[in-house]
Amino acid sequence: MVVKVGINGFGRIGRIVFRNAIEHNDVDIVAVNDPFIEPHYAAYMLKYDSTHGQFKGDIKVDGNNLTVNGKTIRFHMEKDPANIPWSETGAYYVVESTGVFTTTEKAKAHLKGGAKKVVISAPSPDAPMFVMGVNHETYKPDIEALSNASCTTNCLAPLAKVIHDKYTIIEGLMTTIHSYTATQKVVDGPSAKDWRGGRTAAQNIIPSSTGAAKAVGKVIPELNGKLTGMAMRVPTANVSVVDLTVRIEKGASYDEIKQAVKEASEGSLNGILGYTEDDIVSTDLNGDNRSSIFDAKAGISLNKNFVKLVSWYDNEWGYSRRVLDLLVYIAKIDGNA
């Protein structure tokens, strides 16, 4: 059974989720809501994308709705999530991608319009957090609003899980070298809460904070308090990379660690965790579906208990694919797929 899905917020992630859904046989996007984008502009933004290229399909506007590859997509422009009539199109599963309604209470407003479950495409201060391949099997059907965590947590957690399960992580530090995002500035501008974050994105490497490493402790409880990290925002449009430095309890050579990651990428984490020995750079992974692509050649070890691991991720495309995978999984558990 195909899962009918609605998207609230047709910004960066909302549109990339939509594009991913075209390739996802188990998902049917039936409705979109965005109070700040009218249908003609939505069609334009969906069709043309500076990072992922032109949409490979047919997009038209029919009244207040979109027609994509011959299929009608209801388009709403409600500011209040409680007023979006999701039930009219059978959109019982909603992707909350505005970045605004990230608490459980705010996300559950969608239920008033007929939605049954809401997946928040961002970290949430109080909603249960799930990362595919790591803790998704702990989902219970009574959960109405849940978070797909962040793109960085989705990259870091599968790798950390493999290393911890095999060698036991004592402690670690993470740095994500992260492409700029919409929250940054085209030119220097005011940013009272983060002075460095107000500097122009395309000219600077900008140190920043991230909760991604600490969030791993929420999806892998054994690592709670053992990981923390920071971000370096860099002048690239897409694709980011995690640098994870850990002390491990059970000593292992770097070759042994590579083999463990390779086996996981071909087994239980296939499609989520990748492995490469190619001499890749960031643009080579633009549009990659996986959450995390381990770069075997980029890592180093000081000794058998202290190692630096490097893993890439398309922070837009790969993350959006996991949003859909999580939706399909919870629908299956709920008995609706």
Curated annotation (Swiss-Prot):
Residues with site note (Activates thiol group during catalysis): 178
Question: Which residues does the record give as NAD(+) binding sites?
Answer: 12-13, 34, 79, 315
Name the pathway.
Carbohydrate degradation; glycolysis; pyruvate from D-glyceraldehyde 3-phosphate: step 1/5
Any one GO MF annotation of this record: NADP binding
Cite the active-site annotation. Answer: 151 (nucleophile)
EC code: 1.2.1.12
Q: Name one GO biological process term.
A: glucose metabolic process
> In terms of domain of life, where is this protein from?
Eukaryota
The protein's matches in Pfam families, at most eight in alphabetical order, are given as: Gp_dh_C (PF02800), Gp_dh_N (PF00044)
Q: Where is this protein localized, as stated in its record?
A: Cytoplasm
Please give the catalytic activity noted in the UniProt record.
D-glyceraldehyde 3-phosphate + phosphate + NAD(+) = (2R)-3-phospho-glyceroyl phosphate + NADH + H(+)
Alphabetically sorted, this entry's keywords are: Cytoplasm, Glycolysis, NAD, Oxidoreductase
Where is D-glyceraldehyde 3-phosphate bound in this sequence?
150-152, 181, 210-211, 233
Q: Does the keyword NAD apply?
A: yes
What InterPro entries does this protein's entry cite? Answer: GlycerAld/Erythrose_P_DH, GlycerAld_3-P_DH_AS, GlycerAld_3-P_DH_cat, GlycerAld_3-P_DH_NAD(P)-bd, Glyceraldehyde-3-P_DH_1, NAD(P)-bd_dom_sf
**What Gene Ontology cellular component terms go with this record?**
cytosol
NCBIfam families for this protein: GAPDH-I
Q: Describe the protein's quaternary organization and the partners it interacts with.
A: Homotetramer.
Q: Which family does the record assign?
A: Belongs to the glyceraldehyde-3-phosphate dehydrogenase family.
Please identify the protein, giving its name as recorded. Glyceraldehyde-3-phosphate dehydrogenase
The taxonomy runs: Eukaryota, Fungi, Dikarya, Ascomycota, Pezizomycotina
